[in-house]
């Protein structure tokens, strides 16, 4: 276990697509508890960062560490930075684990941390290849941001749209003709860079796509992207939750 890593799980109650999502029941446990259980034991500390008393109480009830943050935070990364400033103990790597990724796996977290074996890595995240038989409807889902990578494995752009556009090819064939990457919402930062990027003003692309990582790219920061072979189920809507619960039952994880 890497003792120089802290995981912070930003969680807010007021989601426009799924209000109260962190406390939604997943077969007897809240979603935030299932996310917390995924990270405990993988890194030395896991801290939930929230601005809501209901979430704070729920985390304390299951024995987790929690810190209250400002309701003015405009993104999960800003909440992560505030939490680290309050409770950090000099860790060298800060993980920002989204509170709607209850199926994140140990191997994925270890992979992300391994990015910092290279001293030039300041920010890292994960991507999964869309399989060749994925329908265009699923590829085109704006809740599953796509990444375009350079030859060195760094992000060129993130988009809710399908990029690149394949001219002259039927959309249902796109995944058979090109490799598309799905972004998995977990980040890792060096603390100095985390503080810098959260002090920057919002960028135009970030505002257009509502993807905070575009701010970092627009201001010249490089994001290293590691490819994972494991799939996850991110939960953005009540319909996603129904699929997640069905998956829990199918895996005997009740």
From Swiss-Prot:
Can you supply one Gene Ontology CC term for this chain's record? cytosol
Q: What Gene Ontology biological process does one annotation of this record name? A: CMP-keto-3-deoxy-D-manno-octulosonic acid biosynthetic process
Q: What is this protein called?
A: 3-deoxy-manno-octulosonate cytidylyltransferase
Which NCBIfam families does the entry link to? kdsB, PRK05450.1-3, PRK05450.1-5, PRK13368.1
Which transformation does this protein catalyse, written as a reaction? Answer: 3-deoxy-alpha-D-manno-oct-2-ulosonate + CTP = CMP-3-deoxy-beta-D-manno-octulosonate + diphosphate
Which InterPro entries is this protein grouped with?
Cytidylyl_trans, KdsB, Nucleotide-diphossugar_trans
**Pathway participation:** Nucleotide-sugar biosynthesis; CMP-3-deoxy-D-manno-octulosonate biosynthesis; CMP-3-deoxy-D-manno-octulosonate from 3-deoxy-D-manno-octulosonate and CTP: step 1/1; Bacterial outer membrane biogenesis; lipopolysaccharide biosynthesis
**Where does the source fall among the domains of life?**
Bacteria
- Chief site of localization: cytoplasm
In its UniProt entry, the species of origin is given as: Porphyromonas gingivalis (strain ATCC BAA-308 / W83)
Annotated transmembrane regions:
none
Tell me where in or outside the cell this protein is found.
Cytoplasm
Q: What is the lineage of its organism?
A: Bacteria, Pseudomonadati, Bacteroidota, Bacteroidia, Bacteroidales
HAMAP family hit by this protein = KdsB
What does this protein's UniProt record list under function? Answer: Activates KDO (a required 8-carbon sugar) for incorporation into bacterial lipopolysaccharide in Gram-negative bacteria.
Q: Which family does it belong to?
A: Belongs to the KdsB family.
Q: What is its EC number?
A: 2.7.7.38
Arranged from A to Z, the UniProt key words for this protein are: Cytoplasm, Lipopolysaccharide biosynthesis, Nucleotidyltransferase, Transferase
> Its Gene Ontology molecular function terms?
3-deoxy-manno-octulosonate cytidylyltransferase activity
